[in-house]
Amino acid sequence: MSEFKRLMRLKLKMKQKRPEFKRQDWFKCSRIGTSWRRPFGKHSGMRIGLTHRAAVATVGYRGPALVRGLHPSGLQDILVNNVKELVALNPEIQGARIAATVGKRKRIEIVKKANELGIRVFNVSKQKQDEFLSL
């Protein structure tokens, strides 16, 4: 388990050091936005990797393979649409994220069932959980 914790800490450090990858010339035209697109231009300094240009997303920025894609808590992030899907989760290694399309009534049911089963719900705050449990 200590190896897992070490890798999670390493993942956090790498994330803090990782630059914010922005699209080439994002500051010149507001309509293109900052979302990452790889530069393909023939004379692009960013593509070539000139030091005074923005960073380009490459393999070296990836986190450790064993903890890649996990929630910062160390649990797998599983999307849940109903109580039936929630029951199938393993609370030791998986956590729930309630889908955006789920309404309030079903959301309350999911939170109550998750509390019974000891499953962590990532996208519902503690205040909301307390509110839902009191209903």
Curated annotation (Swiss-Prot):
Keywords: Ribonucleoprotein, Ribosomal protein
Gene Ontology biological process terms in this record: translation
Organism placement in taxonomy: Archaea, Methanobacteriati, Methanobacteriota, Methanomada group, Methanococci
Family: Belongs to the eukaryotic ribosomal protein eL32 family.
SMART domains: Ribosomal_L32e
Annotated gene: rpl32e
GO cellular component: cytosolic large ribosomal subunit
Molecular function, one GO term: structural constituent of ribosome
PANTHER family, per the entry: 60S RIBOSOMAL PROTEIN L32 AND DNA-DIRECTED RNA POLYMERASE II, SUBUNIT N (PTHR23413), RIBOSOMAL PROTEIN L32 (PTHR23413:SF1)
Name recorded for this polypeptide: Large ribosomal subunit protein eL32
A Pfam family recorded for this sequence: Ribosomal_L32e
The UniProt record lists the keyword Ribonucleoprotein: yes
Organism: Methanococcus maripaludis (strain C5 / ATCC BAA-1333)
